[in-house]
C-alpha cells in the first residue's frame, strides 16, 4: 500500500520538472520574455550540450557489469513483439491506400520509446529507490545505441524507397550501384536528387546528389542569377497575373528546331528579339548583370505547325510554350551545359551538339472538363548520363522520344500545364504506394514498382544512417559514457576532478534545461492538440495503454516478478520521448501526432503514472 510519505516523495521529484516546463511556457505565451529566435538558441544549447552531457553523466556512472539482463531482455522482447506485429500488419492489403510503413514507424515510436532520460530516472527513483534509476539508465543506453539507430534505419529505408520509386518507377531493378555524394545527409523529400548513367550492358549507375534547392537555400546573400526563363509555362497557368508585352516569335522558334513555320497570325507577326544565337550560345548571359527575359507566358497560343515526316518533332503539345534557357559559369548556376532541341535523326533536325530530349507523358491525368478549373502538374528534368540525353518528366507516365513523339504528343492531356526547372527531383513528388501487397517488384503499374537489389539498398541505407549518427551529439555521449564506464568499473579508475566537475556543472543543469526547452516547444506550437481529437485519443491509448500492456506481457514471459515487474510497467507508461518526434518532423512522418503525444502526453503523464503506481502497489 502506498503511504502518504511515498506519494509526497514522488511529487517532490516530479513537480519541479513541471515548474521548469510551465515557466518556459509562460515566458513565451504570457510574458513575452523570449522571442522565437531566442527560443531556437536555447533549444540548440540543450540539444548540443545539456542533454548529451546529461546522458554521459548517467551512463558513465552506471556499472555496466551489474546490468539486469532479464530486465533488458523484457524491454527488448516488448519492442520485438511490437515490431513483429506491425510488420505483419503492414503486409496486409490497405483498403484506404495509406502508407502502412509510415503508420508502422509512428505506432512503434508511440508504444515503445518513452521519455526515460528526463522523466523516467527521477520519477522511478522516487517511486522504487536508487536501483530503479540504474535500470532506467540501462534502458537509456539501449535506446540511444540500438533503438534510435533502428528508427533512423526505418526512416531512411522509407525515404530510399520513395526516392527510387519516384525517380526510377520502371527501371529500378536495373540499378547496380548507388553512389552518394559526401554532402548528402538525408534522402527525404527535397534533400536529394539523382543522376543516372547507363552502362553498355543497360545497367544503371546512379549518383545521389544534394538537391540544388537545398544548396541554393544555404546562400546567405542572394546573387544575380544568369539563368533566364528556366520554366515552361502553359496558357492556363495563372502564376503571373500581370500580362506584359512579348517579343517571343513562335515562327523563329519552330524554324530553329526544324519544324515548318506556322501560318502568320496577328499575334505572331511581330519582330522577335529572341534569336538562334541566344538559344544556342553559351556566352549569351556571361555578363554579371542578368538580362530581362523577353518571353511572355501569357502571349497568345501558337498555331499548330505542320507535322514533319522524319526526324523533326511535332510541336503541337497542347497549352505549352517551350522556352529554352542558357547558362554560364556563374557561381549561382547549377547547370554547366546548354540543353538544346533535336529531332530524332532525320532531315531537318539540328545537329550542333544537341542533346536528345525524351518526354515522359502521364497516362492518367484527368481531361479538361470545361468547368474552368485549372489542372496543374509539375514535372522535372532528369539529367541522364551516358548518351547525354535529357528526360522531361511530367509526374510519371510513359517515355516518348524520337519519331514516337509525333504520334504521342497529340494525346497530351489538357490537364498538363506546367513543368518546373529542377534538374532531377519533382517540385511536388508523386504519391507512391510503397506499402501495397505488390510493392516488392514486378512491372511498374498501379501500386507496383521495381526495387534495386537488396545489397544496393542496404548499402545506401547504411551510408545514410551512419552519416546521421556521426552528426548526432548523443551518439558520442552514449558511446563515450559506455566506454568510460567499462574502463572505470573494470579497473576502478576515477575520472580526474577537473573533468568530472566540468561535466557535472553542465549535466546538473541538463534535466531542468531539457524540461525548460520542452516548455518553449509547447509555447511555440499553435495548438496543444495539433492532430485532431480522434488521432490524439488513439495516440494516447497507444502510449499509455498498449505500450504498458505489451510490456507487462513481455515481462511476465521473461519471468519478472515483484518490484522489477512494477518498474517495467511504469516506465512503459512514461510520456512520449522527444527524439522520435524530432525524427518524425525531419522525415515528415506524422509530426502532428508525435507533437501531440509529446505535449499533451507530458501534461497527463503525471496522473497516469501515479495511477499505475498506486494500482500496482495495492
From Swiss-Prot:
Q: Which residues lie on this side of the membrane: Cytoplasmic?
A: 28-38, 91-104, 156-478, 524-539, 585-597
- The chain's Extracellular topological domains, given as residue ranges, are 1-6, 60-70, 126-134, 500-502, 561-563
The record's keywords, sorted A to Z, are:
Auxin signaling pathway, Cell membrane, Membrane, Stress response, Transmembrane, Transmembrane helix, Transport
Per the UniProt record, the source organism is: Oryza sativa subsp. japonica
Q: Which GO terms describe its biological process?
A: auxin export across the plasma membrane; auxin polar transport; auxin-activated signaling pathway
Could you tell me the gene encoding this protein?
Answer: PIN3A
What membrane topology does this protein have?
Multi-pass membrane protein
| Entry GO CC | auxin efflux carrier complex; endoplasmic reticulum; plasma membrane
Q: In which tissues is it expressed?
A: Expressed in coleoptiles, roots, vascular bundles of leaves, shoots, lamina joints and vascular bundles of the lemma and filament. Expressed in stem bases, stems, leaves and young panicles.
| Name this protein carries in UniProt | Auxin efflux carrier component 3a
Q: Which Pfam families match?
A: Mem_trans
Q: Where found? A: Cell membrane
Q: What else is known?
A: Seedlings silencing PIN3A display abnormal crown root development. Seedling over-expressing PIN3A exhibit better shoot growth, longer roots and a greater number of adventitious roots than the wild-type when grown on PEG-induced osmotic stress.
Polar residues bias: start-end ranges = 281-293
> Coiled-coil segments, which residues?
none
Which NCBIfam families does the entry link to? 2a69
Q: What induces it?
A: By auxin and osmotic stress. Down-regulated by 1-N-naphthylphthalamic acid (NPA), an auxin efflux inhibitor.
Query: What does this gene product do?
Result: Acts as a component of the auxin efflux carrier. Involved in the polar auxin transport which may regulate crown root development and response to water stress.
Family recorded in the similarity comment: Belongs to the auxin efflux carrier (TC 2.A.69.1) family.
Q: Name the source's superkingdom.
A: Eukaryota
Q: Which InterPro entries match?
A: Auxin_eff_plant, Auxin_Efflux_Carrier, Mem_transp_PIN-like
Amino acid at each position: 500500500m502506498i503511504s502518504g510519505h511515498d506519494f509526497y516523495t514522488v511529487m517532490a521529484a516530479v513537480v519541479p520538472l513541471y515548474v521548469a516546463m510551465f515557466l518556459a511556457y509562460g515566458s513565451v505565451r504570457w510574458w513575452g520574455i523570449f522571442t522565437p529566435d531566442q527560443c531556437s538558441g536555447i533549444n540548440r544549447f540543450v540539444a548540443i550540450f545539456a542533454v548529451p552531457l546529461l546522458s554521459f553523466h548517467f551512463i558513465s556512472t552506471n556499472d555496466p557489469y551489474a546490468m539486469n539482463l532479464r530486465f533488458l531482455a523484457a524491454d527488448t522482447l516488448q519492442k520485438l513483439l511490437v515490431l513483429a506485429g506491425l510488420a505483419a500488419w503492414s503486409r496486409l492489403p490497405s483498403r484506404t491506400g495509406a502508407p502502412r510503413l509510415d503508420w508502422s514507424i509512428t505506432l512503434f515510436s508511440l508504444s515503445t520509446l518513452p521519455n526515460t532520460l528526463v522523466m523516467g530516472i527521477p520519477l522511478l527513483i522516487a517511486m522504487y529507490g536508487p536501483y530503479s534509476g540504474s535500470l532506467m539508465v540501462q534502458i537509456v543506453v539501449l535506446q540511444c545505441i540500438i533503438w534510435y539507430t533502428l528508427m533512423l534505419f526505418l526512416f531512411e529505408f522509407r525515404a530510399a524507397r520513395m526516392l527510387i520509386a519516384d525517380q526510377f518507377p520502371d527501371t529500378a531493378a536495373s540499378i547496380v550501384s548507388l553512389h552518394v555524394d559526401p554532402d548528402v545527409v538525408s534522402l527525404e523529400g527535397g534533400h536529394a536528387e539523382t543522376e543516372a548513367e547507363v552502362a553498355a550492358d543497360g545497367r544503371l549507375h546512379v549518383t545521389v546528389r544534394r538537391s540544388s534547392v537545398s544548396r541554393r537555400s544555404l546562400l546567405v546573400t542572394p546573387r544575380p542569377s544568369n539563368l533566364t526563363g528556366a520554366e515552361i509555362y502553359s496558357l492556363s497557368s495563372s502564376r503571373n497575373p500581370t500580362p506584359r508585352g512579348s517579343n517571343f516569335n513562335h515562327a523563329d522558334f519552330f524554324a530553329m528546331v526544324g519544324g515548318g513555320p506556322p501560318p502568320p497570325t496577328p499575334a505572331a507577326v511581330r519582330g522577335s528579339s529572341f534569336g538562334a544565337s541566344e538559344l544556342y550560345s553559351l556566352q549569351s548571359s556571361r555578363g554579371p548583370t542578368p538580362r530581362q527575359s523577353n518571353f511572355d507566358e501569357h502571349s497568345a497560343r501558337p498555331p499548330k505547325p505542320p507535322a514533319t515526316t522524319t526526324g523533326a518533332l511535332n510541336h503541337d503539345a497542347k497549352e505549352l510554350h517551350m522556352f529554352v534557357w542558357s547558362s554560364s559559369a556563374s557561381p549561382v548556376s547549377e547547370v554547366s551545359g546548354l540543353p538544346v532541341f533535336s529531332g530524332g535523326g532525320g532531315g531537318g533536325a539540328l545537329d550542333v551538339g544537341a542533346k536528345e530530349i525524351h518526354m515522359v507523358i502521364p497516362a492518367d491525368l484527368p481531361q479538361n472538363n470545361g468547368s474552368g478549373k485549372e489542372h496543374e502538374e509539375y514535372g522535372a528534368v532528369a539529367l541522364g548520363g551516358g548518351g547525354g540525353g535529357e528526360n522531361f518528366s511530367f509526374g510519371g507516365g510513359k517515355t516518348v522520344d524520337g519519331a514516337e513523339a509525333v504520334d504521342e504528343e497529340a494525346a497530351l492531356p489538357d490537364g498538363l500545364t506546367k513543368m518546373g526547372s529542377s534538374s532531377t527531383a519533382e517540385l511536388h513528388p508523386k504519391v507512391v504506394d510503397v506499402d501495397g501487397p505488390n510493392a516488392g517488384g514486378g512491372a511498374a503499374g498501379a501500386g507496383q514498382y521495381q526495387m534495386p537489389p537488396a545489397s544496393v539498398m542496404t548499402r545506401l541505407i547504411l551510408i545514410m544512417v551512419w552519416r546521421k549518427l556521426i552528426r548526432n551529439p548523443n551518439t558520442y555521449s552514449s558511446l563515450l559514457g559506455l566506454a568510460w564506464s567499462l574502463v572505470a568499473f573494470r579497473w576502478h579508475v576515477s575520472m580526474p576532478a577537473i573533468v568530472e566537475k566540468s561535466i557535472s556543472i553542465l549535466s546538473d543543469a541538463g534535466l531542468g534545461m531539457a524540461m525548460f526547452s520542452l516548455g518553449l516547444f509547447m509555447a511555440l506550437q499553435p495548438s496543444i492538440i495539433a492532430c485532431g481529437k480522434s488521432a490524439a485519443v488513439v495516440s494516447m491509448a497507444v502510449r499509455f495503454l498498449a505500450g504498458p500492456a505489451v510490456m507487462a506481457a513481455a515481462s511476465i514471459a521473461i519471468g519478472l516478478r515483484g518490484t522489477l515487474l512494477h518498474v517495467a510497467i511504469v516506465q512503459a507508461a512514461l510520456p512520449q520521448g522527444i527524439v522520435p518526434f524530432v525524427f518524425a518532423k525531419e522525415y515528415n512522418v506524422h509530426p502532428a501526432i508525435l507533437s501531440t503525444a509529446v505535449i499533451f502526453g507530458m501534461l497527463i503523464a503525471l496522473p497516469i503514472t501515479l495511477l499505475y503506481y498506486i494500482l500496482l502497489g495495492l
